[in-house]
Amino acid sequence: MSEQQHHARKLPTDVEQIPIVWRYELLKYLRSKRLIGSVIIAAVVIALIFVVPPATGNPYSGKDKAVTLFVTGPQGMSISGLPYPGNAGLINRSVVVASSIEVFQDGTLLSSTDWTFSSATFLGNIVLFTHNTTGHTYTATYKWHGTSESFASGFVGFANLLIVICATFFGADAIVSEYQARTGYLIFPNPIKRASLYLGKFGASMTAGILVISMFYGVTAILSLVSVSGLDKDFLLSFAFALEYLLAVMAIAYLISTLMKGTTGATVLTFFLFVMILPIVDSIGSISGFKASWSVTFSAGVMSNILTSPYPTDSISEFSRAGLTIHNYVPDPTTSALVMLAYAVVAIVISMVLFRRKEMTG
């Protein structure tokens, strides 16, 4: 009976073999400590970015006490409904908690009916007085915090390098290691197509990378909610661009892995291609006056730029004494998304074809 059941068993189909390879590759990352190492790197960087500014005297939030308000005279702006236009004191903080504001006139607490707070002016955060302020000194006590935009930007700036690290750890040697370590002699003769093997490996690499990037963005979001009481409205869009950049970089890493003959060369080339070589080309464009919209590393800038409101535009900086003109190019979000997707698709197709044709030698 058992022998009949044994003969009745069917081999998994090509599609069913993909998740099997996927699972074993993920287990390999766990055994080799690569996934854990990537998470540790991300955690250390998050800790440093979060701790260093407050430790050096730049906290994310706080409370200012008895801060002198420099009140403008009647020649200032005219506010509808106020009998004394222009009597306004500026609070020089990014975001002020309106409910926490206390205003003092010559050391005496003013009633909230004698002033109003507004953050919707070209001056920023101001206290508008409903009476003549001539001859008086005004101070204010209030809670404040930084903007969610600036907080998120400080963290997302590292996401680019973290993605390259993930591609280096999980993709650079994914293919070439089977040839260098001669494990291909054990794997390739099995009844599994190269395409299934490739897709399983690539899926595992992307899963590991997504776990690391998701952890990075997730912790950043929590810290933002705790530290500045909010999350930038484009934060999730930045996360989406980060995942697309991960897809493009991972695909290129796999292409390099199919072309190289050794794991060391593939790892080094993958890392420096995205950290040094392509960024140098992008910088040359800023000096020469051509916009490297085709560059995947240039397009990656959209991850942090999308957090800026309004979205930045191209500009030119003139240095007349040096006779130098610097073009400050900014990647367009739509173009960047298409460029990264194109790199991913082309690299995956080419690397898969090369992998199917590559044979064991030696």
Show the residue positions of the predicted features.
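Secretory targeting signals
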Residues: 9-12, 39-42, 46-64, 143-174, ...
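Transmembrane helix-loop junction
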Residues: 28, 177, 190, 221-225, ...
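Helix-loop-helix units of permease transmembrane domains in multi-pass membrane transporters
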Residues: 174-206
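Alpha-helical transmembrane segments of multi-pass membrane transporters/translocases
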Residues: 14, 309-362
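Extended beta-strand solenoid/passenger and fiber regions
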Residues: 59-114
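Short hydrophobic, aromatic-rich alpha-helical segments embedded in or entering the lipid bilayer
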Residues: 289-322
